[in-house]
């Protein structure tokens, strides 16, 4: 069984298309900042793509403490297998306690695949998330 004390931090999968960040990235990083402040940890953006290091700094203005950039020509365009492998490898290595992925077409493909590979739960379409030491409260659209 995993030692959950090893897991620390709130991560946001930051989606880019053709070298531009998506508006959902900024919304998620802002929400992640609130969660991280409650949990007493850092916000990390995870940005995959080709030649995307230059756009990573934009996330700092919305609350990201740091951004991990996985830059490769193989990641220029989204492919399920490549992105899921990189995201899962990063999660397994660095162990964030929360990973936020936007409810976009890519997020709806990537999120469940990562959850299955990581043997963890997934909450889809949450509009608000409160975390405390003893509980998690989610708000879902009706």
Model-derived regions, located:
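Short, glycine-rich nucleotide/cofactor-binding loops
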Residues: 12-27
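Histidine-anchored nucleotide/phosphate-binding helix
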Residues: 25-36
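Short internal beta-strands
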Residues: 44-49
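A glycine-rich helix N-cap at a beta->alpha junction
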Residues: 58-79
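Proline-aspartate-enriched helix->loop->beta-strand connector
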Residues: 95-96
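Short Gly/Thr/Asp-enriched flexible loops that form oxyanion-binding sites at enzyme active sites
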Residues: 106-118
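Short, acidic/small-residue loops that bind anionic groups at enzyme active sites
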Residues: 117-135
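Conserved small/polar residues in nucleotide/adenosyl-binding loops
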Residues: 136-142
